[in-house]
């Protein structure tokens, strides 16, 4: 009987410890998120370029002038992520005419979905494992609360 109680107390303490650990880690993640958000929102944006890119974006979230299929050292699909980043910045940064336009958010999500679905390859491990994911995350972070 005493062993059962000790076991229950031990398990309760372990569970409590894990919960507080998870809460602390979540706080750390929020600190990192806020720092990244602050850094990205301090970047300059080209609103007129974002408007031009939006105007020629295809209904599937792609751009006609980008080659998503050819595997080359120069990764043409990189321009897709750079455009999405600029558009996401225009959407997220207060004080410009594209700030929080609902149709803009839909197009950003469409562009992210297209890139994820097509999954273009450069043939270069660095871009596949580091470059593209680090660029892909920027619109995701900027729209975190809305996705």
What residue spans do the PLM features occupy?
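N-terminal secretory signal peptides that target proteins for export/translocation
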Residues: 1-3
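Contiguous, function-dense segments enriched for cysteine-driven chemistry
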Residues: 41
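Sec-dependent N-terminal signal peptides
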Residues: 6-15
């Amino acid at each position: 009987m005493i062993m059962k109680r000790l076991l229950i107390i031990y398990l309760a303490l372990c569970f409590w410890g894990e919960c507080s650990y998870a809460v602390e880690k979540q706080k750390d993640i929020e600190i990192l998120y806020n720092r990244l958000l602050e850094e990205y929102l301090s970047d300059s944006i080209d609103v007129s370029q974002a408007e031009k890119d939006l105007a020629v974006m295809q209904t599937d979230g792609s751009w006609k002038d980008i080659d998503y299929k050819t595997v080359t050292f120069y990764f043409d699909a990189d321009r897709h992520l750079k455009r999405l980043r600029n558009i996401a910045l225009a959407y997220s940064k207060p004080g410009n005419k594209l700030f929080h336009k609902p149709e803009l958010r839909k197009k950003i999500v469409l562009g992210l979905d297209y890139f994820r679905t097509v999954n273009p390859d450069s043939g270069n491990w660095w871009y596949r494992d580091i470059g593209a994911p680090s660029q892909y995350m920027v619109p995701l972070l900027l729209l975190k609360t809305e996705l």
